[in-house]
From Swiss-Prot:
Compositionally biased residues, Basic and acidic residues: 60-81, 439-454
Ranges annotated as biased composition (Low complexity): 353-379
Naturally occurring in which organism (per UniProt): Phaeosphaeria nodorum (strain SN15 / ATCC MYA-4574 / FGSC 10173)
Biased composition range(s): Polar residues: 343-352
EC number: 3.4.22.-
Subcellular location: Cytoplasm; Nucleus; Preautophagosomal structure
Keywords: Autophagy, Cytoplasm, Hydrolase, Nucleus, Protease, Protein transport, Thiol protease, Transport
Name of the featured protein: Probable cysteine protease ATG4
SUPFAM superfamilies linked to this entry: Cysteine proteinases
Pfam families cross-referenced by the UniProt entry: Peptidase_C54
Chain positions covered by the region annotation Disordered: 32-93, 343-390, 429-467
Active-site residue numbers: C149, D325, H327
Length: 467
C-alpha cells in the first residue's frame, strides 16, 4: 500500500469509524476488571467560600487532565504506541487504556511464506470475491487479508489466555520495557510455519480436519476446533482446551476429562463455547448474560462481530462492547525460537516439509529447517525489538452496540483450578435473563442409545382407562 492509498483509507476511517469518546457514567468492564467511568470528585476541605471554589475548580481541572492522559510518563512516551495521536482518546480512564493496550492484538499480516492454494476445483468458489481477485495470479497466499479475521480473533483468545496464565492478569505492556516471557508468547503466533499457533498452522489444520479450504473464511466452530487441536499438539504451552461442541452446553463430565490429570489435579483449561444467540441479531433476552460473560474474572473475551467480519471483544460498558479489530494489515511477525535448545527440542515434523490432505481439501506448507532461523545470542534478552512487539498492542478503542452484533460467536473462559471452576460455574449460571452458557452434569446419550429397560417403565393406557 502506497502513501496515497494509506492516506485515503485513514480519511475514510476517520469519517466512518471515528474514535469513540467516553460519554457514559456507567462502569467499564474489561475481562473481569472493573473501571469507574469517572474519577471520584475530591472532598473539599473546610475553608472560606472563595478559597474553596478556587481549589475545587483547580482540583477538577487536574483530575480531568490526568484522566484523559494516555502516556505512562510524558518524558518517556511523547506519543501513543504505533504512532497514534493521544488526543484521540477522549475522557477514558487511563488505567482502562493501559489494560486495553496490554491485551494481545492479532491482525492481518502480509509478506509471509506462501500458504499454498488447494487444487480442489471447489476451493475457488469457497473464497470471497476479494480474496479471489487479490490472489488471482499467485499460487499461494502471502497475506491473510480478506479471510483470516476469525483466525486472528482465535489467536487473540489463545494468546491472551497464555499471557494471563504466564504473566498474570495485572501484567501491563510498556513499549520501552522488553519482557522476555511476553516475547516468547508472541513468538508462538509468528507468521511462520514453524510457530505452533501461526496462521499457517491454523489454515493447515482447518484444511485437514475442518473442511476449510486455504483462503476460505473460518467460522467460530472451525476456529475453536483448531485452537483445541493445536494446543493439544503443543503441550509445552501448558494449556488444556475444552470445546462445547455445536451448542452452548458445557458438560461437566467431559470437561473434567480434559481438565483433570491422572493425579486428580485440575490443569489450566480454556473453555470455548460456540453459540448463536438469535437469527439476525442478538435476542434481547440474552443481553445481560452476554455482558456478564465479560465481567466474570475468568473471561478471556469473545470472538465474533459482524457477518463474515470477526472482532475480538474484551470490554463492555452499558450496551456498548469494546473490541480489538484484526482488519488492519501489517508486515509479518517473524519467528524467533526462544533458544537453541527449544528450537532443537520441538517435534520432528516442525523441521520438515509437511503435507495435509482431507477428503474435501488439500494444502501443502513448506517448513524451513529450524537452524535457518537465528536464535538470540543472549537467551535472557527479548526475542523481538520493540517495533515488532508494538504491532501486537494498541490503545485504539473500537466500539459496537450489542444490537449491531452478529449472534454467532465464540465465548472464551480460563479456569485454573477446581475452585476457579466453581466460581466460573456460579458466574455463568447466576445471570439476569437467559444464560448464554448452560452447565450440565453429564452429556446425554445420543438418540437411539437411551438406557436399556426404560421402555419397560412406561405405563400403558388403553382407551377404556382414559378419563
Amino acid at each position: 500500500m502506497n502513501d496515497f492509498e494509506r492516506f485515503g483509507r485513514n480519511v475514510v476511517r476517520t469519517f466512518y469509524d471515528p474514535p469513540p469518546c467516553n460519554e457514559s457514567n456507567e462502569p467499564i468492564w474489561l475481562l473481569g476488571q472493573r473501571y469507574d467511568s469517572r474519577p471520584p470528585l475530591p472532598k473539599p476541605a473546610p475553608s472560606d467560600s472563595s478559597t474553596t471554589a478556587t481549589a475545587t475548580a483547580q482540583a477538577e481541572r487536574n483530575e480531568d487532565e490526568s484522566w484523559i492522559r494516555t502516556s505512562i510518563d510524558d518524558k518517556e512516551r511523547k506519543e501513543a504506541p504505533n504512532g497514534e495521536d493521544p488526543t484521540q482518546y477522549g475522557n477514558w480512564p487511563s488505567a482502562f487504556l493501559d489494560d486495553f493496550e496490554s491485551r494481545v492484538w492479532m491482525t492481518y499480516r502480509s509478506g509471509f511464506s506462501p500458504i499454498q492454494k488447494s487444487q480442489d476445483p471447489k476451493a475457488t468458489s469457497a473464497m470471497s470475491f476479494r480474496v479471489r481477485m487479490q490472489n488471482l495470479a499467485s499460487p499461494g497466499f502471502t497475506s491473510d487479508a480478506g479471510f483470516g479475521c476469525m483466525i486472528r480473533s482465535g489467536q487473540c483468545i489463545l494468546a491472551n489466555a497464555l499471557q494471563i496464565l504466564r504473566l498474570g492478569r495485572d501484567w501491563r505492556w510498556q513499549e520501552n520495557h522488553a519482557d522476555k516471557d511476553h516475547a516468547e508468547i508472541l513468538s508462538l503466533f509468528a507468521d511462520d510455519p514453524q510457530a505452533p499457533f501461526s496462521i499457517h498452522r491454523f489454515v493447515e489444520h482447518g484444511a485437514a480436519v475442518c473442511g476449510k479450504y486455504p483462503g476460505e473464511w473460518f467460522g467460530p466452530s472451525a476456529a475453536a476446533r483448531c485452537i483445541q487441536d493445536l494446543a493439544n499438539k503443543h503441550r509445552e504451552a501448558g494449556l488444556k482446551v475444552y470445546v462445547s461442541g455445536d451448542g452452548a452446553d458445557v458438560y461437566e463430565d467431559k470437561l473434567k476429562q480434559v481438565a483433570v490429570d491422572e493425579d486428580g489435579l485440575w490443569q489450566p483449561t480454556l473453555i470455548l463455547v460456540g453459540t448463536r444467540l438469535g437469527i439476525d441479531k442478538i435476542t434481547p433476552v440474552y443481553w445481560e448474560a452476554l455482558k456478564a460473560s465479560l465481567q466474570i474474572p475468568q473471561s478471556i473475551g469473545i470472538a465474533g462481530g459482524r457477518p463474515s467480519a470477526s472482532h475480538y471483544f474484551v470490554g463492555v460498558q452499558g450496551n456498548n462492547f469494546y473490541y480489538l479489530d484484526p482488519h488492519s494489515t501489517r508486515p509479518l511477525l517473524p519467528f524467533h525460537p526462544p533458544s537453541l535448545a527449544a528450537a532443537t527440542s520441538d517435534t520432528p515434523n516442525l523441521t520438515a516439509s509437511t503435507t495435509s490432505v482431507s477428503s474435501t481439501t488439500s494444502s501443502t506448507t513448506i517448513v524451513p529447517p529450524a537452524d535457518s532461523i537465528p536464535a538470540p545470542s543472549d537467551p535472557r534478552q527479548s526475542l523481538y525489538p520493540p517495533s515488532d512487539l508494538s504491532t501486537c498492542h494498541t490503545r485504539r478503542i473500537r466500539r459496537l452496540q450489542i444490537r449491531e452484533m452478529d449472534p454467532s460467536m465464540l465465548l472464551a473462559f480460563l479456569v485454573t483450578s477446581e475452585a476457579d471452576y466453581q466460581d466460573w460455574k456460579e458466574g455463568v449460571q447466576g445471570v439476569q435473563g437467559k444464560s448464554v452458557v448452560h452447565v450440565q452434569d453429564k452429556e446425554p446419550p445420543p438418540r437411539g442409545q437411551e438406557r436399556e429397560g426404560a421402555i419397560d417403565e412406561v405405563e400403558s393406557w388403553d382407551e377404556d382407562g382414559l378419563q
